[in-house]
Every structure is written in C-alpha cells, then in structure tokens.
A protein has these predicted regions:
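Cytosolic regulatory regions built on CNB/CRP/Popeye-like sensor folds
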Residues: 1-162
C-alpha cells in the first residue's frame, strides 16, 4: 500500500451548509449559530483506491465525515497480520475514537475512490461543548458504531459471520 500524503489528498475547503449528504452526517442538525462557532476550515479531501487516510497510532488531526465511497478500518496483530475491524460507508464518521484518545486506533484505507471532509479536533471539541445539537448527533454516531460492533460480534458468536 502506498501512503497518500495529506497535501496530495487536499482538494480545498468544504461548504458544510451546502453538502449533498448533510442530513446523514455529523453536522445535520447544526443551525446558523452553530456554524458561526466553526473557526477553522473543514478540509475537502479525496483518496484513490488503497489510499491511506491515517495509520494506527497516528496523532489525530481530526475526524472525517465520509461523503462518498467506502473505507476499511484495519488493525495489525502482534505478529504483523492485518484484520479488518469495520467497513464504513457514506455518512459514517471515520476516526471517531480520536475524540476520546487524540490518536487513531486503527488504519483507515480507501476501498474505492473516497471523498471525505476532515474536521479538526479543535472544531469538534468546541462544537460538542457549545452545541447540544452536535453533541446529540455525536452520541448517535457513537451508538451506531457500537451497535454495529455488537451486531457483528453477535453474528460471529452465533455462526452467521463469514
């Protein structure tokens, strides 16, 4: 896998108010006052198939809203083998764990051509404390990720996961 440097993936800044999938993403419920709290640019980025969005253990620069494509989250075992832990689709949040830890706990790789918005951690922390709308949406996304993991574990334990 060839890593993609952030500079080559950057396509400009995003206009979150005009996003075509805004109703699916973290900023779905924000109002004009909430948008006024955003004091850093939201980066519009694109990655080709196999593009590395971030590596396991990297210091987090932000969280990513997946606008188009699919991303796999991969963890490495102690002996160097890789395991896919989740596949994310449009509307999902990539790197959500960084809000709690400041680091990414897996590697994020584009499964096809991917478009994401990178939201700086500072923006997320500021909005989550000052906007109940973002805080509620963030809790919904955490719950969706947890439910997906729980469902997968249940399928694995009951024999339907392949």
């Amino acid at each position: 896998m060839i890593p993609i440097h952030v500079e080559s993936a950057w396509k400009g800044t995003s206009d979150c108010r005009a996003c075509g999938i805004r109703d699916l993403v973290l900023f779905a419920d924000l109002n004009e006052d909430d948008f006024g709290l955003i004091h850093a640019p939201i980066d519009d980025m694109a990655y080709p198939v196999g593009g590395l969005i971030y590596s396991e253990g990297d210091k987090a620069l932000g969280v990513f809203t997946l606008r188009q494509g699919m991303v796999k989250l991969v963890r490495s075992t102690a002996d160097g083998r890789e395991r896919i832990i989740r596949v994310l689709r449009a509307g999902d949040v990539v790197g959500i764990e960084a809000l709690a830890t400041g680091h990414y706990d897996s590697e994020a790789v584009a499964l096809n051509d991917v478009k994401v918005c990178r939201i700086p951690l500072g923006v997320m922390h500021n909005l989550s404390t000052q906007s109940p709308r973002l805080h509620n949406r963030l809790m919904q996304k955490w719950q969706q990720a947890l439910k997906g993991a729980d469902d997968w574990l249940a399928d694995l334990n009951f024999g339907t996961a392949r």
